[in-house]
């Protein structure tokens, strides 16, 4: 049996929300995956708050007026494709990179700010 993408898409278009929900659940069970969006990591606990941080999460808080330039820098930093980088920039605030060394985090922040973005290190 040949896989016909157009037929699958047509069937999905005609399905109800309940049927689509059941489909997602079945796919999750069959392939051992989840359709849930990734969740940001919670802040460090109070014990770590006093210690000097040696790794940071780089968060894009705003793309500013020069979105195209920011998307290019995000692609360069993360290795994401154009669509994924655009979605990340459009979805600001969003984590660009997690758990990077202090020097690398500062470098990434400088590149993004130079492109016109607002960035915070967490």
UniProtKB/Swiss-Prot annotation:
Molecular function GO terms recorded: mRNA binding; structural constituent of ribosome
Protein name: Large ribosomal subunit protein bL12
Keyword annotations of the record: Ribonucleoprotein, Ribosomal protein
Family listed: Belongs to the bacterial ribosomal protein bL12 family.
SUPFAM superfamilies: ClpS-like, Ribosomal protein L7/12, oligomerisation (N-terminal) domain
InterPro entries from the UniProt entry: Ribosomal_bL12, Ribosomal_bL12_C, Ribosomal_bL12_C/ClpS-like, Ribosomal_bL12_oligo, Ribosomal_bL12_oligo_N_sf
GO-annotated biological processes: translation
Cellular component annotations (GO), alphabetically ordered: cytosolic large ribosomal subunit
Domain of life: Bacteria
Gene3D superfamilies linked to this entry: 3.30.1390.10, Single helix bin (1.20.5.710)
NCBIfam families named in the record: L12
Summary of the function given for this chain in its UniProt record: Forms part of the ribosomal stalk which helps the ribosome interact with GTP-bound translation factors. Is thus essential for accurate translation.
Subunit structure: Homodimer. Part of the ribosomal stalk of the 50S ribosomal subunit. Forms a multimeric L10(L12)X complex, where L10 forms an elongated spine to which 2 to 4 L12 dimers bind in a sequential fashion. Binds GTP-bound translation factors.
Pfam families to which the protein is assigned, alphabetical: Ribosomal_L12 (PF00542), Ribosomal_L12_N (PF16320)
């Amino acid at each position: 049996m040949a896989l016909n993408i157009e037929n699958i898409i047509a069937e999905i278009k005609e399905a109800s929300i309940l049927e689509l929900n059941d489909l997602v659940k079945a796919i999750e069970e069959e392939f051992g995956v989840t359709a849930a969006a990734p969740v940001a990591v919670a802040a460090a606990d109070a014990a770590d708050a006093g210690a000097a941080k040696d790794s940071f999460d780089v968060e894009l808080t705003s793309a500013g007026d020069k979105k195209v330039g920011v998307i290019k820098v995000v692609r360069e930093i993360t290795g994401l494709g154009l669509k994924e980088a655009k979605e990340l920039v459009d979805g600001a605030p969003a984590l660009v990179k997690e758990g990077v060394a202090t020097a690398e985090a500062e470098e990434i922040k400088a590149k993004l700010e130079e492109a016109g973005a607002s960035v915070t290190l967490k």
